[in-house]
Amino acid sequence: MGMLAEQADHVIGVDTHRDSHAAAAVAARTGAVDATTTIPADAFGYKRLLRFGRKHAPARRVWAIESSGSFGSGLTSFLLAQGEWVVEVDRPKRPARRNGAKSDELDAVRAAHESLQREHLAQPRARGEREAIRVLLITRRGAIRARTKAINQLKALVVTAREELRHQLRNTPTDELVYRCSRLRTLPSHSTEHRATVLALRHTARRILALEAEANDLETEIENLVKRTVPQLLDELGIGPISAAQVYCSWSHRGRLRSDGAFAMLGGAAPIPASSGQTIRYRLNRAGDRDLNCALHTIVLTRLQHDPATRAYAARRTAEGKTPREIKRCLKRYVARNLFCLLEATGPHPVTAPRPPRSRVIGHCS
């Protein structure tokens, strides 16, 4: 059933949910189901599940956990701390139900079978400082999006305001508009509509300023963590603290991804053939981790503006008939390879239990 069957005697598939987890112990050689169980998703349940694994899979065992970064994160951290071997599996494709049959334990069996059929299995992402950076990135991203939404709302309020207000604020740059609206005042002689509009503009502008301050504070904290964890990324041309943080969070730790090609595929930067006849083309990859893809795109745009070597490359490829989109795709693939090799050589190791030996990293790293 694949390479995993050669390294383990049992696979314990786990279907994770918010309040409970279902598990199934499956023989790696035959795929036979030895036992199933369901536990609460808490510390007591994790201990029960570990005892279940030791009882029904006493020899070499591996835990194949769905959603190890969300509903299964607590269980994954617990098992790794206990020295267990854990792999991450995507949600398996659900087959057509027979007579309406469906249960969490059946899903756990499918997760185990899915892991046995795959040639490559991912390790769970590291926690610790990487997880700290990840949650700060998510929070900052939420603040930025909320700020953008509030700015759009502010401009819409200006458009519909009465002429005496609209005349004061129209054609004003965004930063100045926010500042002026945050300091608007009313007089008792103003109409009810005027006072209400000013109140709405003032509160919206102050919300924008608060969100901007929040995003700046979070960026400072992210930068401090990046400097402490992967400072080498900041030495690369065109990489700021936010891009470096996203690249590190997506990569996670040494050995998690088997090659620079896998990292590029994760970031949606791997070429997808779209050739026909005498025309050799590659199209954009719109799958993968879009936040990582955004970071790679930002790095490429910065280098196109400030790096003479990148600009010379773009000019040469343009002369060869490549479109700007194709050139950026090529550059993103190069950046992905460069950063992967840098992190594999100098990045942090995972603080997890030992696993069976992996083959060497495949790619163009030297």
What are these regions (language model features)?
Residues M1-S366:
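A detector of single, family-specific signature residues
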